[in-house]
Amino acid sequence: MSKKHCSELLPNKMFRNQDSKYLIPVQKEAPPVTTLPMKASTVKSPHNCEAILRDADPPISLSSVNLSEQLRSGVFLKPKKQIKYWVDERNSNCFMLFAKNLSITWSDDVNYWTWFTEKESPNENVEAVGLKNVCWLDITGKFDTRNLTPGIVYEVVFKVKLEDPAYGWDTPVNLKLVLPNGKEKPQEKKVSLRELPRYKWVDVRVGEFVPEKSAAGEITFSMYEHAAGVWKKGLSLKGVAIRPKQ
């Protein structure tokens, strides 16, 4: 039997380094990793978004790469930026109806109300209205629930502010919410504004409801007080928010 060189007797997983007397294990080449194709993630479009954005002011492209960001920060709608639309973290539709979109008794008379500019965002202003002196307070608005996300609990909220000198608020105001098709009794309550913090916008909640596709229609909401005949001053109104309950 012929003698074999010792290197020939080494296991096939070892070799001798020419520069070293030590044996170095040979690493097997790792098999290629098979990468499974990933499914493209899809984000569900907000309810009725395409129809809503037809009234965007300025216009917005549905194919914009920044559409999601724009919807989160808010989009103004026609006419004349009287409505703001945005989408919350749950992908639910939210709306703000500014004072110009509401029916306010005597708001066009400078003896009773005064209009002023309020900053809504770094680049956008909206019109708010301040009460100078009235005894007949009547603010009403309406909204089509077809643009609200079905199955979500929504609340209707007046955005108001009191500034001194303010008077006439010892008498509570009436709040009323009427749902579509008269299926439910109107939600009504009285709220005192006297103790509201001054010089800051606060929420005055009217009521809540769950919009349904089968019962879509128009809601109406109002804040009023004209039975007591008391003169009122110091109230400012920014608008009404219709948003998922917080």
Curated annotation (Swiss-Prot):
Pfam families: PP2. Vascular tissues, specifically in phloem companion cell-sieve element complexes. One of its GO terms (biological process) is response to insect. Coiled coil: none annotated. InterPro entries: PP2-like (IPR025886), PP2-like/Lectin (IPR052147). GO terms for molecular function: carbohydrate binding; proteoglycan binding. This is Protein PHLOEM PROTEIN 2-LIKE A1. It comes from Arabidopsis thaliana. The gene is PP2A1.
